[in-house]
């Protein structure tokens, strides 16, 4: 296979049989939408949606020194994560630049599952492997060992309960437990990227189609629909969740992104980027260069990544993500803007959309927060 040929998930034929529009995403052929991305988005907000996320990058870290390695390699306090729990964290360069944002699951006392973004999986694998020197731990590429299926939305707990004996009521947000779903062995994690309650199911690729079909049948009465990456992007945008390559990059630190809370300076020992991030934290507190904010359009024109944010003809920031919001019924965006213009309600802010000044309201993120 040539290096340019896209990879296919275990559900590729099934997506095509459902009439999915496919797209190349991070070297994978993935479903963009099955019909209307707006309908898929609203189904997740009100009922439930089913996603194939098998392009994500799973990396297993095992051994007596696994916790110490991850505490050194990542910015979070991974050693403090209990067995069966998960943590959102980041891996940074020595200069503090973000290599990726991650979720780390502690499966056993000496076993962790690191889940990287598809576009950065190899970068994260290489960094962890390089940083493992001197630690009694093994870093293993498990990208081919898992298919990942997510069911997201307010109806997702009921749908999943009908297919498993696992204690879903006792499964907290950012927790995971082994179980079986429709007879399929799975890691059942209460995580997601939509702003809704939901579950991510890590299974053997050979079982993926069986599990997808079982979830489809069990979810039909509740209004579950298959969902593509297009609505996943608008869902995470409404929820104010960052996307690597847009809100996060190697040119930004976690503090630049307003996510300094993931950096745990109080943990024992050194970690990659500690010195640079200490400086970044001090700068962010005294004089932040730019701040990540939400923007809501007063009109109908949609901003895209890279469009300038302006006040009185002066560029004061840049859009990182933008789309029509199915929930709000108006275009929305995330943008980095100068701190002086970052307060909600700041007057005169607009986006330069192909030479036209379009007025936008500055708001605090997220745009949408589910009722719990």
From Swiss-Prot:
Its EC number(s): 2.1.2.10
Gene label: gcvT
Family to which the UniProt record says this protein belongs: Belongs to the GcvT family.
Covalent S-S links between cysteines: none
Reaction(s) catalysed (UniProt annotation): N(6)-[(R)-S(8)-aminomethyldihydrolipoyl]-L-lysyl-[protein] + (6S)-5,6,7,8-tetrahydrofolate = N(6)-[(R)-dihydrolipoyl]-L-lysyl-[protein] + (6R)-5,10-methylene-5,6,7,8-tetrahydrofolate + NH4(+)
NCBIfam families found in the cross-reference section: gcvT, PRK00389.1
Cited function: The glycine cleavage system catalyzes the degradation of glycine.
Keyword annotations: Aminotransferase, Transferase
GO molecular function, a single term: aminomethyltransferase activity
InterPro entries listed in its UniProt record: GCS_T, GCS_T_bac, GCST_C, GCV_T_N, GcvT/YgfZ/DmdA, GcvT/YgfZ_C, TrmE/GcvT_dom1
Domain of life (superkingdom): Bacteria
GO biological process: glycine decarboxylation via glycine cleavage system
A GO-annotated cellular component: glycine cleavage complex
Pfam families linked: GCV_T (PF01571), GCV_T_C (PF08669)
Subunit description: The glycine cleavage system is composed of four proteins: P, T, L and H.
Protein name (database record): Aminomethyltransferase
